[in-house]
Amino acid sequence: MSDEEVEHVEEEYEEEEEAQEEAPPPPAEVHEVHEEVHEVHEPEEVQEEEKPRPKLTAPKIPEGEKVDFDDIQKKRQNKDLMELQALIDSHFEARKKEEEELVALKERIEKRRAERAEQQRIRAEKERERQNRLAEEKARREEEEAKRRAEDDLKKKKALSSMGANYSSYLAKADQKRGKKQTAREMKKKVLAERRKPLNIDHLSEDKLRDKAKELWDALYQLEIDKFEYGEKLKRQKYDIINLRSRIDQAQKHSKKAGTTPKGKVGGRWK
């Protein structure tokens, strides 16, 4: 056999030995091992059961000293009373402090109220003085204006009296103008009085009042319509006047450039 074959045989032999060592033992051997372990643990259980238990005994009170339960209870009651008294004292102190704070707050409120009333009084007095001053200034201005008007009227009268006969015609024209204004004002009042009829509704029933209200509403609605129509008509007329004026201005500009005199208003008359 060569050296390589010898080495191969030795390796196979070694592998078989390793496999035998790693294989588990037979069942009989395993059972014996468990029995040995069980036998080893049994003495420990016996020892635990045989351990003696300690005996419990009541504490002994020294024979030389006696315990006074009444004294202990009295001390406890005194301690509770002291704590209760301390709580009562702290409560009354807090109550007293709150009352003092409340009194101080009321005093501050009253003081602030008095200060506010004084400020309002001073403000009202200043406002009254200001109103009086304004009234005095207004009266003074009115007096000065009346005096100035009187002086102007006197100057006008003197100037007119110096004109002689023309003064009477001037007064007549002035009276005529005043008469026209007065007549127009009276006519306006008359027309308004005719249109504004008295409203007698005290004797009307509910249905008639409803009809009257509807009638007034219709009249008011018609007046609003007329007002709107007149306003639109006035706008159109103003627009037409503006257009006419612009056309006249344009015509005058062209005529000036051409050197001709257009037909227009001269001396208050149209040519």
Swiss-Prot record:
Protein family (similarity comment): Belongs to the troponin T family.
Molecular function, one GO term: troponin I binding
Basic and acidic residues: bias regions: 29-53, 62-74, 113-155, 183-192
Composition bias, Acidic residues: 1-21
Sequence positions bearing Phosphoserine: 2, 90, 161, 168-169, 205
Gene Ontology annotations for the cellular component aspect, listed alphabetically: troponin complex
Domain of life: Eukaryota
Pfam families from the UniProt entry: Troponin
Positions bearing Phosphotyrosine: 221
Record-level GO BP terms: regulation of striated muscle contraction; skeletal muscle contraction
Keywords: Acetylation, Muscle protein, Phosphoprotein
Modified residues (N-acetylserine): 2
Signal peptide: none
PANTHER family named among the record's database cross-references: TROPONIN T, TROPONIN T, FAST SKELETAL MUSCLE
Descriptive protein name: Troponin T, fast skeletal muscle
Function: Troponin T is the tropomyosin-binding subunit of troponin, the thin filament regulatory complex which confers calcium-sensitivity to striated muscle actomyosin ATPase activity.
Residue ranges, annotated region (Disordered): 1-74, 113-192, 249-271
